Amino acid sequence: MMQNKGKKYVKKFIILLFWLAVWQILAMCVDNFLLVVTPLQALRALLTLAGQAEFWQSAFGSLWRIVLGFLLGAVLALFLAAVSYRYKIAEEVLQPFMVFCKAVPVAVFAVLLLIWWGSSMLAVAICFLVVFPNIYLNTLEGLKSADRELLEMAEIFRLSFRTRFFYIYRPALKPFLLSAFQLSLGMCWKSGVAAEVIGTPAHSIGGALYLAKIYLDTAELFAWTAVIIVLSVCFEKIIFYGISLFFRWEPACKRPAMPQKTATRERRTLRVGDLGKKYHDHWIFRHVEREFHGGEPYVLDTPSGSGKTTFFRCLCGLERPEEGEVSGIDTFSVQFQEDRLCEDYSAVKNLEMVLGDAALAREILAQLLPEEALDQPCRELSGGMKRRVSLVRAMEAGAQCVLLDEPFTGLDEENRKKAEAYIRRKAGGRILILATHIRPGEELSQTVRMWEVQDFGHGS
């Protein structure tokens, strides 16, 4: 690994030497120090400047203005993007301002602000106006791109806002924020220094560039350009280091999302009264009447495509039925047809989000998964392993009613038997309803009441 790092630095050094050579050749071809100076002449000018107090005052004066403008723009953009995501009216109110910021040239803003405020805070304002719309729009787009299925899962399992943000919204935001910050960091330095050249405030790089232009001091101009590049690169490295730490951080989930007391020993009854659901003019099911009692699993015994998944969604509140009602139960947990796991995180972390205890999550998952799979990102697990993780999450959540939609998909005979034994062991006095095309084995079927509902899937 150290060898690869060394090769990487050598490669970068060679690339730097190449561009210095191009610069040197260009200066020799032009042969006019008023137009292009050599790298050595620029270095001499930089060393001369570095010995002056004014140089450091100008460098740090510009640095704090540009950093302040960037931070103000970024923080406000992140906050207002979150508000706009939550409240549509906020997005509509801000839309004209975003169009205005994107369409009006920076030079126009610079002249107007110079007239209104003077030059001292011009660079701060210009950096703000460049950074704000870019980060706002990308953040809002990232929030909107969050996986709808994962958000439904979070709603069912009652995940806290903190957990939803870090493990659902944050991965969705990552590509958008990285792109927005990379573009904004470069633009804020270019626009900030340009604003200083226009306003020429005291102790600023822009003011020094303006003086170098007046006195035709090209070497000093190149020296200040090198300073801008160094400051810009260093600032970008610091910001992206902080961003990388933020995206790598996996905060612990310290409290159960759904307190275990909800699954009491008292046997509850789920009442389904004259339930009906349709899409457009077609009834998926209609006139479904049933009571489900705790302590004994039920299996939906209906043909494929008859609406079992939609029925589950109506039971747990993800779909609103056209007719009837569901009552008697406050909390549901669901194993969806899709696994709906946070793919960037391990099986242990996915269960920890619900249980609030990483050690307990590891202990439980070890019953159905091999040890080496527990800490792998879920995207690297096989389909059968993911299915078992989603099964454990549904069974351990502590809900009064557990809905399992195709829990045995992707499982071989041995793992299916383990899953059936686990379901039977964990069912307790809760209501447990399964929808599966794979008939449960003997271990589970001894306690299964097969259910055929008249007209289920054939409503009119």
Predicted regions and their residues:
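ABC-family nucleotide-binding domains
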Residues: D405, L411-D412
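Hydrophobic anchor residue at the start of the ABC signature
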Residues: L391
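Transmembrane alpha-helices
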Residues: A125, L129, R162-A195
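Conserved ABC ATPase "signature" region
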Residues: A359-L374
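Q-loop/switch helix immediately C-terminal to the Walker
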Residues: D344-L360
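Conserved ABC ATPase signature
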Residues: P377-L381, M385
